[in-house]
Amino acid sequence: REIEAQGAMREAAARGEIQFPWPVPGAVIATYEQTGNMGIDIAGTIGEPIKAVLDGTVQYVGQNVKGYGQFVIVRHNVRLPGKSAMPLVTVYGNTSKILVRINESVRKGQTIALMGDSDSDTGAKMRFEVRQGPPLDPMKYLEPRKEP
């Protein structure tokens, strides 16, 4: 079943129909390319769980990169059509605690980190990026939110 689901995900990506769940439920407070942003910033609370948006493997865990604080990069086995031949990766920045290690397999929806405070005037937030080679606008790939 799992292999079938992964195959279906790759087929959806090839058709340009892939959509991710949100890594956290907060409001978008900075959009792609706004003030040099290569992703989006999502508001939240310190310690809030940050979840992987797709199955993948942790490619990098780091800290002290300007604009990211502690962050995680997850590599996924899908490629988006019309983009670079490089693998799709997602970046989760401004965390207070990282819960995964390099080369660890993660599942869609798994908590991989906890939200932190980036010492900005906007309070607790996370940076979320989608890359396949160059950065892509995450809003094009996140599931539409349901209105209350």
Residue ranges and their predicted role:
Residues 43-44, 92, 97-100:
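Short alpha-helix capping/helix-loop boundary micro-motifs
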Residues 31-33, 45, 77, 95, ...:
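Generic beta-structure capping elements
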Residues 72, 102-148:
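Conserved, short, structured surface segments that act as functional micro-motifs
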Residues 31, 61, 95-98, 115-118:
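Residue-level recognition of beta-strand microenvironments
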